[in-house]
A protein has these predicted regions:
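Active-site neighborhood of phospho(di)ester-bond hydrolases with catalytic His/Asp-centered motifs
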Residues: 5-7, 26-31, 63-70, 94-96, ...
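Binuclear metal-dependent phosphoesterase catalytic core
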Residues: 98-105, 175-183, 187, 194-229
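Active-site-proximal segments of metal-dependent phosphoesterases and phosphodiesterases across multiple
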Residues: 33, 37-49, 142-184
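A short secondary-structure junction signal
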Residues: 121-126, 150, 155-162, 200, ...
């Protein structure tokens, strides 16, 4: 099955004809909100319904699944999100939960999406390590696809750009790394740390991909990942 994955749109909805080839499934790993309105929930709801949703519906695929990121505080309103992006529609929102996608061939793929990130600053969906461990303990074992906004600690989580706050150290999520080693999903697609390693990195039996499309300066520099699973 061919899928397309991307993350960290920050309001940039890439031209469909230029960036997307036909596939079955598109996965978006959070930080969808435009930076200039991310804190205005009324404007964000309007943008999600009138701009983001039609864009997703225009993508050349059968299904779009997306999760929130730390810049998507409006997505804490689960009632609104589930009403606009239900599981039985083309465009589905997952909030730390599972979904079974049935492919054109009839094969079922188990998917779990989680928005949570390690704590820093006053952003959405961020928790202390003790809480993250409890949250990640609910991730099922042997998933086909895990969608996470945050990246696991120790696996390609060093910023590669030469920017003033780059320490050259691993800055990923330790409870997430532990959960992945225990749960062993086949694929992990993530973002959040824009310019870390975008190649396939193996975590045990898990193939991890950073699918962010932005640089640390919020410029669109990476193409969406297209992969057959």
């Amino acid at each position: 099955m061919k899928i397309c994955c991307l993350s960290d749109l920050h309001g940039t909805l890439l031209p469909v004809e230029d960036y997307f080839e036909p596939c079955e499934l598109v996965c978006i790993c959070g930080d969808i909100s435009p930076l200039n309105i991310q804190g205005n929930h009324r404007k964000m709801r309007h943008w999600l319904i009138n701009t983001f949703k039609p864009w997703c519906e225009s993508l050349p695929c059968d299904k779009v699944i997306f999760i929130a990121g730390n810049h998507d505080s409006c997505m804490h309103n689960e009632d609104f999100m589930y009403a606009q992006f239900p599981k039985d529609s083309k465009v589905t929102y997952l909030f730390h939960e599972s979904y079974i996608y049935t492919s054109r061939s009839g094969k079922e793929y188990s998917i779990f999406g989680t928005p949570y990130c390690k704590l820093f600053g006053n952003w959405a969906f961020m928790e202390m390590d003790e809480i993250l461990e409890k949250l990640y303990s609910t991730i099922p074992e042997n998933l086909d696809i895990l969608l996470s906004h945050d990246q696991p600690f120790g696996y390609g989580d060093i910023i590669l750009e030469d920017i003033y706050w780059n320490t050259g150290e691993h800055i990923g999520n330790k409870p997430l790394a532990k959960a992945i080693l225990e749960k062993q999903p086949k694929y992990l697609f993530c973002g959040h740390l824009h310019s870390t390693d975008h190649s396939c990195i193996e975590i045990g039996n898990t193939k991890r991909y950073n699918v962010s499309i932005k640089s640390e300066k919020y410029e669109p520099v990476y193409d969406p990942l297209v992969i057959k699973i």
